[in-house]
């Protein structure tokens, strides 16, 4: 089964508290969400493989390290996932970006896919799937399956806030995908929202209702 990890770095926890506050405005929410994403990706990429190469500095030749293995791509689940992309790209500017569009039926809480656009070499990349909220797990599972159908074999899911129900659902359906969260909250309410959560991440990111 894929591992589930809460990233307890003090800066991540502090910044998450700032955007949980209902008084945080759109600008503040958007900026801090990207800051958290950047910190989280810094943490989850600690295990990336390195290889030795020879380079020449102004002082002479030397053997140094560079990233090896698969290249990276970030895949936001639209629309809220867009609010984490810039933070990831600040840390990994060469990463390709794919997009998966999902919307949730407010009555059934079931996800529906409406858009998928991926780099052509998706099977050769380590994918970082980003979405602020992991609630029921339906959207995450549908996104993961869409990526697998297109050849993806290496994926990590990065979320700001997770509910136990969503973690269990993703681990049951996709045990090969590791999940990273800034927080594991208490439960889902009757409307499928995470409690205490941070509200509707998409609306808070883009100033909509």
UniProtKB/Swiss-Prot annotation:
5-phospho-alpha-D-ribose 1-diphosphate binds at residues 79, 104, 131-139, 200. Its EC number is 2.4.2.9. GO terms for biological process: UMP salvage; uracil salvage. CDD domains: PRTases_typeI. Its cofactor is Mg(2+). The keyword Glycosyltransferase applies. Belongs to the UPRTase family. Catalyzes the conversion of uracil and 5-phospho-alpha-D-ribose 1-diphosphate (PRPP) to UMP and diphosphate. This is Uracil phosphoribosyltransferase. It comes from Lacticaseibacillus paracasei (strain ATCC 334 / BCRC 17002 / CCUG 31169 / CIP 107868 / KCTC 3260 / NRRL B-441). The lineage of its organism: Bacteria, Bacillati, Bacillota, Bacilli, Lactobacillales.
């Amino acid at each position: 089964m894929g591992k589930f990890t809460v990233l307890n770095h003090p800066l991540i926890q502090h910044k998450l508290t700032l955007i949980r506050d209902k008084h945080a405005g759109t600008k503040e929410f958007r900026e801090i969400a990207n800051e958290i994403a950047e910190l989280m990706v810094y943490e989850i990429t600690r295990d990336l493989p390195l290889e030795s190469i020879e380079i020449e500095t102004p002082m002479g030749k030397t053997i140094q390290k560079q990233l090896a293995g698969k290249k990276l791509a970030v895949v936001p689940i639209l629309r809220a996932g867009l609010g984490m992309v810039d933070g990831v790209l600040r840390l990994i500017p060469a990463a390709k970006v794919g997009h998966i569009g999902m919307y949730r039926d407010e009555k059934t809480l079931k996800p529906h896919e409406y858009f998928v656009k991926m780099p052509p070499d998706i099977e050769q990349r380590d994918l970082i799937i980003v979405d602020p909220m992991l609630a029921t797990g339906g959207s995450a599972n549908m996104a993961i399956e869409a990526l697998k159908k297109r050849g993806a074999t290496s994926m990590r899911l990065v979320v700001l806030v997770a509910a136990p129900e969503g973690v269990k659902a993703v681990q049951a359906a996709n045990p090969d995908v590791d999940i990273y969260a800034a927080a594991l909250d208490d439960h889902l309410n009757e409307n499928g929202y995470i409690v205490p959560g941070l509200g509707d991440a998409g609306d808070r990111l883009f100033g909509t209702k």
